[in-house]
């Protein structure tokens, strides 16, 4: 059983809606030790599809792409509910829901699309045992850091980031919910050699969405027409999703996400980090990156 430490000291907290709990040293939003045991004991089915990401790496974007693929490009079906209510997060309970997402998963029939921010070593064993297909999306760490900072500012259930300088230090040391970005992307990169994992990059999807969506279709063994493919590309573009209340989270109460502080969907363009990092921070980040990623074959683009 993973080692659990509740309310680990990661960051100052706003009025609390989520507890921060360390699981094997990884800060998570797990409700309790008892709830973590339920997550660990989750029984996946072979046709369950898992979407795994580090926070702020394109989860909502990929969720919409997968939902449209699974619904053959039917736009109205994909507007049946807002993103958080269409498919569940394995380990989370959101403030606007009466019960944890896992309970919704257990009530629904397969096949299911299930989301998670867990690192690979904390994934319930049944997902590996049942050989579930997993789509993993990785985003370059500089843009991920900036996006995560703004998310902390606008989401009341996240710890107060204080300022960018302090958040930068905590992100670099892995003292944020989700843990170390470096460990997360490397862990899933290694796992892909042993399991059915399609490992995608945020920047690649942004640069050539058609090519990357075709990879997903092949992975899922799904055939669609060129017309439907183009429809999916259009409706999952940043500009369209930003205006779609079923994907931009504006239907949530401002007490949960305050878009007047920062919109959930801000820019979505690789390279925004350059508007925030100082020269010194960038140099420090690059040095730390080289150290932590030494020996890995993973490469990231910080702009396109």
From Swiss-Prot:
Cross-referenced InterPro entries: P-loop_NTPase, Sulfotransferase_dom
Residues binding substrate, per UniProt: 115-117
Gene Ontology MF terms in the entry: 3'-phosphoadenosine 5'-phosphosulfate binding; alcohol sulfotransferase activity; aryl sulfotransferase activity; bile-salt sulfotransferase activity
Main location: cytoplasm
Binding site for 3'-phosphoadenylyl sulfate: 56-61, 139, 147, 202, 236-241, 264-268
Catalysed reaction, written as an equation: an alcohol + 3'-phosphoadenylyl sulfate = an alkyl sulfate + adenosine 3',5'-bisphosphate + H(+); a phenol + 3'-phosphoadenylyl sulfate = an aryl sulfate + adenosine 3',5'-bisphosphate + H(+); lithocholate + 3'-phosphoadenylyl sulfate = lithocholate sulfate + adenosine 3',5'-bisphosphate + H(+)
Enzyme Commission code(s) on record: 2.8.2.1, 2.8.2.2
Active site per UniProt: 117
Compartments, as annotated in UniProt: Cytoplasm
One cellular component (GO) term of this entry: cytoplasm
Further information: SULT1C3 gene appears to be present only in humans and other primates.
Family: Belongs to the sulfotransferase 1 family.
Protein name: Sulfotransferase 1C3
